[in-house]
Amino acid sequence: MAECDGKCDTCPSKNTCPDTKKLLAQQDAKIRENMSKIKHKIVILSGKGGVGKSTVTVNLAAALNLMGKKVGVLDADIHGPNIPKMLGVENTQPMAGPAGIFPIVTKDGIKTMSIGYLLPDDKTPVIWRGPKVSGAIRQFLSDVVWGELDYLLIDTPPGTGDEQLTIMQSIPDIDGAIIVTTPEEVSVLDVKKSIMMAKMLNIPIIGIIENMSGFVCPYCNKVVDIFGRGGGEKAAKELGVEFLGRIPLDIKAREASDKGIPMVLLDCKASEEFKKIVKRIVEKVEGKKE
């Protein structure tokens, strides 16, 4: 047997090595301890890229924060970490101590952790294979000192791969998954895959959000359905899950997002819809446990 180099995640013998099993059990115990301080854990999923899932995650967090909830956002998209930019806290490094890694806190009090905070700059790619990505996610879950939170939102990459599987199998008592889609038929096909994955892993479906549902004209305020309309609601009915609502495209919202300002802080149609959706989510999640 080759000499151990301590790199368990990429070791070909990790599934049979007693040392690895012991370390994973210890890490699982730390994850359970950390997650026990968080009332509600929600995974944000999308079947394909480009549907605005990270934008939805950030604005759900900001809307929950406006309701007085203590909120954290874990950016589990290791290869495409956009949360730091969207929350306006890029170019920031987390502090670490004996207790673990302390999350970055926005000026509004939202706690956040992302691989983006650990890279030298936003141009540096993360060129990792699946096992190392899964190991990084588990380390975030075990080592980040979230403290007591009302909600932890986990922003995942698109698809149904290693990252989603690692999160859903590592976090105990996940309240559910929110699926983000756009109105086109091609996006809706992928929604079904995300929902099937969650159901196979016994993760409840909180509901579907249809993003980019209509464009708000900046001149007349009329909503134009440039990507179609109703695909998310149709998928929800077909699959027997709740349709949470539609978020329109809005130039004001896009400009704010580029500056690291969540659109829920603006006076616009998208902000109104986000607040309605978050109210439905809170009623469903908290009502379920009470």
UniProtKB/Swiss-Prot annotation:
One of its GO terms (molecular function) is ATP binding. Disulfide bonds: none annotated. Pfam families: ParA. ATP binds at residues 47-54. The keyword ATP-binding applies. PROSITE patterns: MRP. InterPro entries: Mrp-like_CS, Mrp/NBP35_ATP-bd, P-loop_NTPase, YlxH/NBP35. One of its GO terms (biological process) is iron-sulfur cluster assembly. GO terms for cellular component: cytosol. The keyword Nucleus does not apply. Keywords: ATP-binding, Hydrolase, Iron, Iron-sulfur, Metal-binding, Nucleotide-binding. Binds and transfers iron-sulfur (Fe-S) clusters to target apoproteins. Can hydrolyze ATP. Belongs to the Mrp/NBP35 ATP-binding proteins family. Homodimer. This is Iron-sulfur cluster carrier protein. It comes from Methanocaldococcus jannaschii (strain ATCC 43067 / DSM 2661 / JAL-1 / JCM 10045 / NBRC 100440) (Methanococcus jannaschii).
